[in-house]
């Protein structure tokens, strides 16, 4: 497969660095010089600057101060560092909020916010767009030829919603365009005759509100789409200015940490306007989940971000080299975990390891957030040594830059599907757990070290051998037909209970569930039984089934009551009034097969099911050797090279028998012994010949 090349043509090294906020220390000029010394010690070669610097750059309206930034840009270049320069729109100045209150967001209760925190701005506001355009243009013109500049970082962690009059009118315009200015089309799409909610004109429509209209699911869904649309439109506004002046400088925006998968912005919509994907990675290590479980959750998001640009390496723009200050418990990373967590990103496709932030703030809300340089101000800390070790390892990985992977497996996680599931009134109000369900299916492949993409339902299915679509409640137009074509041409589809229920407007399909998936799955889903937490049913695997599975498994939370309409029954329910009904089926369709899992299950079932499926389909693993529990392997490659990352997500030393494989350690340059040892929370990176 091809090599994508480096993120910037200016630098052919793995990027290692941090968000750098020198303006916090502008009254202590000796700090800047000390920062440079420490950056060299830690093998730092890139810093992200200016993310929250609007007030420092424009202390009064129309009065600009770039001298300090000039000095920083020159200082970084002189000392061999590159700069990712941010636009400062993530946090606006106080003067703007007071002079132009329309730039402040309005909450869902229709009360305008006071000035405070960050992200407290309206993306629709013409004033806000005007003011950011001025400063973006000045930044681009001033630094377009600066040798340190390698990337634009637009704003910071886009999130949030605004319900001001400007946004409500923009929402109405969005709806007018979507429904061809025909209010009758909207009424049909939203099923407004229920409860007498029919609209006579677009002017009557208000955004969802707890004290207004929260019950029209079509309205709620279109509002979430609008939020993404308006956020993206704002991003494009900033991007257009930078691209006009610096067309050859790549542009990104940093996506939020994995909690963003439950939030209101569909990152797939940004794909056409990103030169590189970047995201902020903040795992919950050493918590209630085991570290290998947490590792699989983070792997899920890494693989999603890699898939957004079709396999192109991404950037881990932020991470903590230690603890955070906003997670419920700020548990320190155990020895080795920082290196493991950092290199896991590289294993899944990142060409950078970056931190928030370089030096701990002395005050304000993130003064206790982990950073490379602690309040002590020197290099003699455990965290600094860990960061330095990461930098040393990255300096040996130049050949890994631009490599990727071509997975045979894809798991569908779709934001619009999540919004629709979360909004549905039933079959359980709580614990629908769409993300958790998708992640559990993903984990079964991660546990086998089978490379996997995480995609949405609009992606191309044809390049995969297996597409897994858990809880595909919403099926947008054309998706059912494309899945049929995928299976017909030899692909394997796995879907589950509560799939094929509604269309893109959250209107239920008529003619039987799973709607557009009914034909390809060869089943009819008649009812869905929602169980209480303490309830349990059991599923018994049929003797002599085509997957060769055996045994009995628990069924909890959801049990779909399905009928075979041509599909092979692989397992049946063991108890309750639906005893004997199918619980797992396989339908031969064209050259491929479609599996339907009718019940929510535990890791044991998914592990056994996907292990059997992987064996049947001879799915490629990162490396074809037995790996001990707790070890995950990922692979990156191009036409010339293949690199395998062995990662130990356990607190115990592990030994791997590499058989007769010819492996060279990328860090030491030595040939790997037949018995390869990996220390607790350790990583080994090898080149395979």
UniProtKB/Swiss-Prot annotation:
<dbReference type="GO" id="GO:0009341">
    <property type="term" value="C:beta-galactosidase complex"/>
</dbReference>
<dbReference type="Pfam" id="PF08533">
    <property type="entry name" value="Glyco_hydro_42C"/>
</dbReference>
<feature type="binding site">
    <location>
        <position position="164"/>
    </location>
    <ligand>
        <name>Zn(2+)</name>
    </ligand>
</feature>
<protein>
    <recommendedName>
        <fullName>Beta-galactosidase Pbg</fullName>
        <ecNumber>3.2.1.23</ecNumber>
    </recommendedName>
</protein>
<feature type="binding site">
    <location>
        <position position="118"/>
    </location>
    <ligand>
        <name>substrate</name>
    </ligand>
</feature>
<comment type="similarity">
    <text>Belongs to the glycosyl hydrolase 42 family.</text>
</comment>
<feature type="active site" description="Nucleophile">
    <location>
        <position position="318"/>
    </location>
</feature>
<feature type="active site" description="Proton donor">
    <location>
        <position position="157"/>
    </location>
</feature>
<dbReference type="GO" id="GO:0046872">
    <property type="term" value="F:metal ion binding"/>
</dbReference>
<dbReference type="GO" id="GO:0004565">
    <property type="term" value="F:beta-galactosidase activity"/>
</dbReference>
<dbReference type="InterPro" id="IPR017853">
    <property type="entry name" value="Glycoside_hydrolase_SF"/>
</dbReference>
<dbReference type="Pfam" id="PF08532">
    <property type="entry name" value="Glyco_hydro_42M"/>
</dbReference>
<dbReference type="InterPro" id="IPR013529">
    <property type="entry name" value="Glyco_hydro_42_N"/>
</dbReference>
<dbReference type="InterPro" id="IPR003476">
    <property type="entry name" value="Glyco_hydro_42"/>
</dbReference>
<feature type="binding site">
    <location>
        <position position="326"/>
    </location>
    <ligand>
        <name>substrate</name>
    </ligand>
</feature>
<dbReference type="InterPro" id="IPR029062">
    <property type="entry name" value="Class_I_gatase-like"/>
</dbReference>
<feature type="binding site">
    <location>
        <position position="156"/>
    </location>
    <ligand>
        <name>substrate</name>
    </ligand>
</feature>
<keyword id="KW-0326">Glycosidase</keyword>
<feature type="binding site">
    <location>
        <position position="167"/>
    </location>
    <ligand>
        <name>Zn(2+)</name>
    </ligand>
</feature>
<dbReference type="InterPro" id="IPR013738">
    <property type="entry name" value="Beta_galactosidase_Trimer"/>
</dbReference>
<dbReference type="GO" id="GO:0006012">
    <property type="term" value="P:galactose metabolic process"/>
</dbReference>
<feature type="binding site">
    <location>
        <position position="162"/>
    </location>
    <ligand>
        <name>Zn(2+)</name>
    </ligand>
</feature>
<dbReference type="Pfam" id="PF02449">
    <property type="entry name" value="Glyco_hydro_42"/>
</dbReference>
<dbReference type="InterPro" id="IPR013780">
    <property type="entry name" value="Glyco_hydro_b"/>
</dbReference>
<keyword id="KW-0862">Zinc</keyword>
<feature type="binding site">
    <location>
        <position position="122"/>
    </location>
    <ligand>
        <name>Zn(2+)</name>
    </ligand>
</feature>
<keyword id="KW-0479">Metal-binding</keyword>
<keyword id="KW-0378">Hydrolase</keyword>
<feature type="binding site">
    <location>
        <begin position="366"/>
        <end position="369"/>
    </location>
    <ligand>
        <name>substrate</name>
    </ligand>
</feature>
<dbReference type="InterPro" id="IPR013739">
    <property type="entry name" value="Beta_galactosidase_C"/>
</dbReference>
């Amino acid at each position: 497969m091809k090599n994508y090349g480096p993120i910037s043509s200016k630098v052919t090294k793995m990027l290692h660095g941090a968000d750098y906020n020198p303006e916090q220390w502008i009254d202590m000029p000796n700090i800047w010089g000390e920062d440079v010394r420490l950056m060299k010690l830690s093998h730092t070669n890139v810093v992200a600057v200016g993310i929250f610097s609007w007030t420092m750059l424009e202390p009064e309206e129309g009065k600009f101060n770039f001298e300090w930034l000039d000095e920083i840009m020159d200082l970084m270049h002189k000392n061999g560092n590159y700069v990712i320069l941010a636009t400062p729109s993530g946090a606006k100045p106080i003067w703007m909020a007071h002079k132009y209150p329309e730039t402040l967001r309005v909450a869902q209760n229709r009360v305008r916010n006071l000035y405070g925190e960050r992200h407290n701005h309206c993306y629709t506001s013409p004033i806000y767009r005007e003011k950011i355009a001025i400063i973006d243009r000045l930044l681009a013109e001033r630094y377009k030829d600066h040798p340190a500049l390698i990337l634009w970082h637009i704003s910071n962690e886009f999130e949030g919603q605004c319900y001001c009059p400007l946004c409500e009118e923009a929402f109405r315009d969005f709806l007018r365009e979507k429904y061809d200015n025909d209010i009758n089309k909207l009424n049909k799409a939203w099923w407004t005759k229920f409860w007498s909610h029919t609209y006579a004109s677009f002017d009557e429509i208000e955004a969802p509100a707890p004290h207004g209209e929260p019950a029209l699911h079509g309205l709620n869904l279109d509002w979430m789409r609008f939020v993404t649309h308006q956020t993206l439109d704002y991003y494009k506004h900033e991007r257009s200015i930078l691209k006009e002046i610096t067309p050859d400088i790549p542009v990104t925006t940093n996506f939020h940490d994995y909690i963003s998968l439950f939030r209101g912005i569909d990152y797939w919509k940004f794909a056409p306007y990103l030169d590189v994907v970047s995201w902020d990675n903040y795992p919950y290590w050493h918590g209630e989940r085991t570290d290998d479980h947490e590792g699989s959750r983070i792997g899920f998001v890494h693989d999603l971000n890699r898939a957004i640009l079709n396999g192109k390496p991404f950037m881990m723009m932020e991470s903590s080299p230690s603890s955070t200050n906003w997670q419920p418990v700020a548990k320190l990373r155990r020895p080795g975990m920082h290196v493991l967590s950092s290199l896991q990103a590289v294993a899944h496709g990142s060409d950078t390891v970056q931190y928030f932030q370089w030096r701990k703030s002395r005050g304000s809300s993130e003064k206790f957030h982990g950073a490379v340089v602690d309040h002590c101000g020197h290099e003699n800390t455990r965290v600094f040594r860990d960061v330095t070790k990461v930098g040393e390892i990255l300096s040996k990985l130049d050949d890994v830059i631009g490599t990727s992977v071509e997975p045979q497996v894809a798991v569908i996680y779709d934001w619009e599907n999540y919004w629709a599931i979360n909004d549905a009134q039933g079959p359980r109000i709580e614990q629908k757990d769409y993300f958790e369900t998708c992640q559990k299916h993903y984990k079964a492949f991660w546990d086998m070290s089978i490379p996997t993409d995480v995609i949405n339902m609009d992606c191309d299915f044809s390049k995969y051998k297996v597409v897994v679509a858990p809880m595909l409640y919403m099926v947008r137009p054309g998706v059912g037909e494309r899945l049929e074509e995928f299976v017909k041409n030899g692909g394997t589809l796995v879907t589950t209970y509560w799939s094929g229920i509604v269309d893109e407007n959250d209107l239920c399909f008529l003619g039987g569930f799973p709607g557009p998936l009914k034909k390809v799955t060869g089943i009819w889903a008649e009812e869905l039984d929602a169980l209480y937490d303490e309830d349990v049913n059991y599923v018994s695997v049929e003797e002599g089934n085509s997957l060769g599975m055996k045994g009995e498994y628990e069924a909890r939370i959801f049990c779909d009551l399905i009928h075979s309409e041509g599909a092979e029954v692989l397992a049946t329910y063991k108890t309750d009034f639906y005893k004997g009904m199918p619980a797992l089926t396989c339908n031969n369709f064209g050259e491929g097969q479609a599996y339907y899992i009718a019940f929510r299950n535990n890791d044991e079932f998914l592990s056994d099911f996907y292990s059997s499926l992987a064996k049947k389909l001879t799915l490629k693993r990162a490396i074809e050797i037995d790996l001990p529990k707790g070890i995950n392997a990922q692979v990156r490659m191009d036409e010339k090279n293949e690199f395998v990352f062995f990662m130990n997500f356990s607190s115990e030393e592990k030994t791997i028998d590499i058989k007769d494989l010819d492996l060279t350690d990328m860090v030491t340059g030595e040939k790997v012994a037949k018995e390869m040892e990996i220390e607790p929370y350790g990583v080994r990176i090898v080149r395979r010949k």
